[in-house]
Structures are given as structure tokens and as C-alpha cells.
Amino acid sequence: MAIRIFAILFSIFSLATFAHAQEGTLERSDWRKFFSEFQAKGTIVVADERQADRAMLVFDPVRSKKRYSPASTFKIPHTLFALDAGAVRDEFQIFRWDGVNRGFAGHNQDQDLRSAMRNSTVWVYELFAKEIGDDKARRYLKKIDYGNADPSTSNGDYWIEGSLAISAQEQIAFLRKLYRNELPFRVEHQRLVKDLMIVEAGRNWILRAKTGWEGRMGWWVGWVEWPTGSVFFALNIDTPNRMDDLFKREAIVRAILRSIEALPPNPAVNSDAAR
């Protein structure tokens, strides 16, 4: 609860210090060492708003513009859709587990929004998708200009196995709008989603993020809030070794963020979500 109250106050302060400025792009080919350390192939985009020039830092600019399935990073906008459509009332509503064993203990239990986000509980979001419907989902996607805005699918969930796709650059654009409460949804819903995204918090910083994985590639997207400005990030990597590669997402991002002092060198003093 203390973290949540601090997060709200800190966000208000951070937003108050935000000022628009011209932004350039700087290729960071030297970041290859972080990917090489973990034998990973991928891209990362970092938008550092602490700096006066507000540079967009990119490793592998070509890949950063290539669209991939958002996988569970889509839970960020999907939660907004569900709240707006009335598929869920608030973070306290309980979704009863149907008793089907889904191979992961975190999924085999009753859920609320917080646990569904933390555990990436797909079945809860499948309920939302059914309630929202394809036509309304398409309208929402176009309304927020999310990737290719295509929720079509021949089999499975459209955000994992369907046509929906988004690039790392586009993830950054979406996250920035959410951070500033500029998406076409109620401000209280945007604030709730940001609260659900909290991973860690220190004395003067907050890390909000979401993982994603569709089998062949994985994401970690989010931002770190500081009093001097926020640092947004979107990474995707190939995962040829499947689950054995998943730890690399956060490991690479954390190493890069620490290298630019966007995360402290030591582990966070508080953790609100196991990833």
C-alpha cells in the first residue's frame, strides 16, 4: 500500500516536470556487448527524458521498426479496453478459476487484475476478449494507433497467435501516451493500469514494466520514473531456446539501464512483482 501511495504522488510530480522538446535518434551500436553477453539477437529502444535533448537511443534501428506479436505486453492496453468496456469493474473483482490445469500454479487459481497482470494469466484476458468482441477490439486498436491494429486470427488469441503486431518504436510511442494519461480512456483507468505495472520501487524511482513471449521471441517494455524525467524502454529478442532464453529479456534491459544510470547499481529496495 505504501508503494502504491508513493507511486501516485511520484507520478504526479514527474508529470508536472515534463516539458516537450525536440528529440533526435542516436544509434548505440556499443550496446551490442550487452546482447553478446547473453548470446541474444534483438533490439532495444530507450527514450531518455531526463536529458535536455531527449534523445531516442536505439540498438539495431532496422529491427526496432519491425513489427512482432505483442504477446503479453498487450495486457497493458487490453486492460484499458476491458475497463472501458465494462468487462472488469476494478482491481478488486475476482475471476474464479474454472479448475482447468494450465500447467502453471499462478494460473491455476482465482485471479484479480493485479494477479492476472503479474502472472500473465492468459485465461482472464481471453474472458475479456470474448466480452469485448472483435469489432470493438478493432475500434480500440485503431483509436490508440496500436501497431497494425489488426485483431484478426484464424486460431488462438489474436495478441499471441493472430495478426496483431507492433514494433519496439511503436511500443515506446504507446507507453509515453499512457505515462502522460493521453490515451482516449478515463484518467483513473490509465492510472490504475500504471499501478498494476509496478515491478520495483526505490526511494526516488519507480520501475513499471510488462513481459511478453509468443514462443519465438520475447519482450520487456516499460519505463523508469525519476524526479528528473522518465526513461522508456522496449526490448525484443529471439528466443530459440524458448523458456531458457526468457531471463535474458530483463537481464539485457537492466544492464543497459544501469549503464546509463537509469536504474541504480544495486537491487531494488522493494519489489512488488515477481517476473
From Swiss-Prot:
Residues 1-21 form the signal peptide. Substrate binds at K210, T211, G212. This is Beta-lactamase OXA-2. It is an enzyme of class 3 (hydrolase). Gene3D superfamilies: DD-peptidase/beta-lactamase superfamily. This is an oxacillin-hydrolyzing beta-lactamase. The gene is bla. One of its GO terms (molecular function) is beta-lactamase activity. NCBIfam families: bla_class_D_main, blaOXA-2_like. Belongs to the class-D beta-lactamase family. Its EC number is 3.5.2.6. The active site is at S72 (acyl-ester intermediate). PROSITE patterns: BETA_LACTAMASE_D. The modification N6-carboxylysine is found at K75. Pfam families: Transpeptidase (PF00905). Keywords: Antibiotic resistance, Hydrolase, Plasmid, Signal. The keyword Hydrolase applies. The keyword Hydrolase applies. GO terms for biological process: antibiotic catabolic process; response to antibiotic. The lineage of its organism: Bacteria, Pseudomonadati, Pseudomonadota, Gammaproteobacteria, Enterobacterales. It comes from Salmonella typhimurium. It catalyses: a beta-lactam + H2O = a substituted beta-amino acid.
